[in-house]
């Protein structure tokens, strides 16, 4: 009986998390930044007018001193360029499951956080081409850096 209740509790917690943060509809993963070589990752989604989407990040990094970490995203709708935008991966609201440890000038930081949100203005095939940039920091180690789209 205890196992059944535990299983039910875990299931409800996971369902509740989706209700709070939204359903994942796309994910773009990075293992390194585009400071030397341009590394472009993309995802394409069929979106409808009025849908609300949000941009989240899942980060697990290690670095020394100061760091800036920015997603640069180019948007295409039905293969036509629409422009682009930038999002700071280190400034999220809300931030969830955060673990940040600093010792001296070395930091390890892991979290999930929301960076931005939109309401879709027209039906179409939306392509998000993303690049991850950082400030010059040769100590940066990316264990995980993912741009996650949810609705």
Model-derived features with residue positions:
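Acidic, Ser/Thr/Pro
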Residues: 18-151
């Amino acid at each position: 009986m205890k196992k059944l209740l535990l299983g039910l509790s875990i299931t409800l917690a996971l369902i509740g998390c989706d209700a709070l943060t939204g359903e994942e509809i796309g994910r773009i993963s990075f293992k390194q930044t585009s400071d030397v070589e341009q590394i472009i990752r993309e995802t394409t989604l069929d979106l409808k007018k009025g849908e609300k989407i949000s941009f989240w990040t899942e980060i697990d990094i290690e670095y020394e001193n100061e760091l800036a970490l920015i997603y640069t995203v180019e948007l295409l709708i039905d293969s036509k360029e629409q422009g682009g935008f930038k999002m700071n991966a280190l400034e999220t609201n809300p931030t969830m499951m955060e673990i940040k440890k600093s010792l001296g000038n070395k930091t390890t930081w892991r979290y999930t956080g929301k960076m931005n949100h939109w309401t879709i203005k027209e039906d179409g095939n939306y392509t998000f081409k993303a690049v991850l940039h950082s400030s010059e920091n040769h100590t940066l180690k990316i264990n995980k850096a993912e741009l996650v789209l949810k609705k």
